């Protein structure tokens, strides 16, 4: 089975999962964090080099204040809880997103986990937090304009533009998985997903299993990736 180098996941459906069970939405987020923990282990078993998890979008600030505060706390708790696994399995963590507007406890944990895991090289776990694809592109344009205004000469190509993205050295996702039955990217990795293969599950994220993950990987391994060209020239 051909294994993708980079898998990205839109972990959707936590709130609906909780609602269906008559539980507070935060219970869905807690269960979702457990499934992410499992997905990291499955990815390690398969030899996947990069795993990106869409955890908190720039649009999620519109949610109720109590839920947003819980998600901030959950980020900190999740990093603390996973440190043993990260060290043991040599998993590097990088955060993809904007620091503006985040509470100090989140910024501190962001810096801490990136620093503590920066030398690990078995797999890179990328947590998209306070992230929006359009905002990333706009930020890149602003950085380019700033450099030009300071006298830097820039030949604008796809590759030079890429250098202004949040994590320019991370390869584009080979496969993007989305749960919950929604069939859209929802402002996720808009630049990087140009040639990504997509796989959609009707299941809600807290119900996602290893069998589901393997099914998506198997589907990917059977696809022919043309990148706009032809397979045989």
UniProtKB/Swiss-Prot annotation:
Binds 2 magnesium ions per subunit. The keyword Cell membrane does not apply. Substrate binds at residues 13-17, 25, 29, 57-59, 61, 63, 178, 184-186. GO terms for biological process: polyprenol biosynthetic process. PROSITE patterns: UPP_SYNTHASE. Gene3D superfamilies: Decaprenyl diphosphate synthase-like. Its cofactor is Mg(2+). It comes from the Bacteria. It is an enzyme of class 2 (transferase). Belongs to the UPP synthase family. PANTHER family: DEHYDRODOLICHYL DIPHOSPHATE SYNTHASE 2, DEHYDRODOLICHYL DIPHOSPHATE SYNTHASE FAMILY MEMBER. This is Isoprenyl transferase.
